Amino acid sequence: MTTTLTRPADGDGSVQVHQDPGTKIEEGALVIAVYGKGGIGKSTTSSNLSAAFSKLGKRVLQIGCDPKHDSTFTLTHKMVPTVIDILEEVDFHSEELRPEDFMFTGYNGVKCVESGGPPAGTGCGGYVTGQTVKLLKEHHLLEDTDVVIFDVLGDVVCGGFAAPLQHANYCLIVTANDFDSIFAMNRIVQAIQAKAKNYKVRLGGVVANRSAETDQIDKFNERTGLRTMAHFKDVDAIRRSRLKKCTIFEMDDKDDGVKAVQDEYIRLASNMLNNVEPLEAVSLKDREIFDLLGFD
């Protein structure tokens, strides 16, 4: 077992899943955890960002941390089996596995892993993430990696699904220019504040997605100390790329808006590689968000 429950932990009086030292990712790789409200486009953002890093010559590994295991299919062009599914087939004897059993090569050489998750209502997502990282380390698959991206389930910030924050250098929060998305973002900021007490993770910034404007995001950023790292408008080619099971970099750049989206992803990847300054954002109380955003 790779994770333990201890008290006290990150939050005051809370019980959290803590990282087993044996699952620690070695220094050197840039590790990014991508969070955001459910359905906001985290997997699309993560996959396109992975592709952008690969375009910059980096060796990239993307780890999907969602029981739906659909994080990487635009990179691999198919749904791949999860780590948990594969481990169950060998009765959790990981020594019987080969890397090609659970890691798949996607667009432009991006390595793809889907951790999967426990059955609904059982188990812990943090344990699954820990098992995945442990398996990757056992097979020495993290040693030749420049960038690791964790694409994390929805806006669930319990101790389990906050586990990828224990491995990450930075967290990127994907949001839209609406109240519900920003409300979820505030909760994620709170989780990062808790994890940053004991782990190296820091806020990298915000990715504004599927939003023509960013006025509400800007208002929240100014109040909390966040910043927008990239802005993707509601370009139909992004939706169509998902339907075609491919990244935005595989779409015709002559299509309306495609080149601008590609350039924005490259810009985001470049900025993340340049030792982006971590943010010391301060979350708001729920009532403060209601007062800040609309509701005049």
Curated annotation (Swiss-Prot):
Name used for this protein in its record: Light-independent protochlorophyllide reductase iron-sulfur ATP-binding protein
Similarity comment text for this entry: Belongs to the NifH/BchL/ChlL family.
Function comment: Component of the dark-operative protochlorophyllide reductase (DPOR) that uses Mg-ATP and reduced ferredoxin to reduce ring D of protochlorophyllide (Pchlide) to form chlorophyllide a (Chlide). This reaction is light-independent. The L component serves as a unique electron donor to the NB-component of the complex, and binds Mg-ATP.
Cofactor dependency: [4Fe-4S] cluster
InterPro entries documented for this protein: NifH/chlL_CS, NifH/frxC, P-loop_NTPase, Protochlorophyllide_ATP-bd
Gene3D superfamilies: P-loop containing nucleotide triphosphate hydrolases (3.40.50.300)
Transmembrane spans: none
Residues at which ATP binds: G39, I40, G41, K42, S43, T44, K68, N209, R210
Species whose genome carries this gene: Synechococcus sp. (strain CC9311)
Cofactor, free-text remark: Binds 1 [4Fe-4S] cluster per dimer.
EC numbers for this chain: 1.3.7.7
GO molecular function, one term: metal ion binding
Catalytic reactions of this protein: chlorophyllide a + oxidized 2[4Fe-4S]-[ferredoxin] + 2 ADP + 2 phosphate = protochlorophyllide a + reduced 2[4Fe-4S]-[ferredoxin] + 2 ATP + 2 H2O
Known partners and oligomeric status: Homodimer. Protochlorophyllide reductase is composed of three subunits; ChlL, ChlN and ChlB.
Region annotated Disordered, chain positions: 1-21
Signal peptide: none
Keywords associated with the record: 4Fe-4S, ATP-binding, Chlorophyll biosynthesis, Iron, Iron-sulfur, Magnesium, Metal-binding, Nucleotide-binding, Oxidoreductase, Photosynthesis
Binding site for Mg(2+): S43
NCBIfam families: DPOR_bchL
Annotated pathway: Porphyrin-containing compound metabolism; chlorophyll biosynthesis (light-independent)
Pfam families: Fer4_NifH
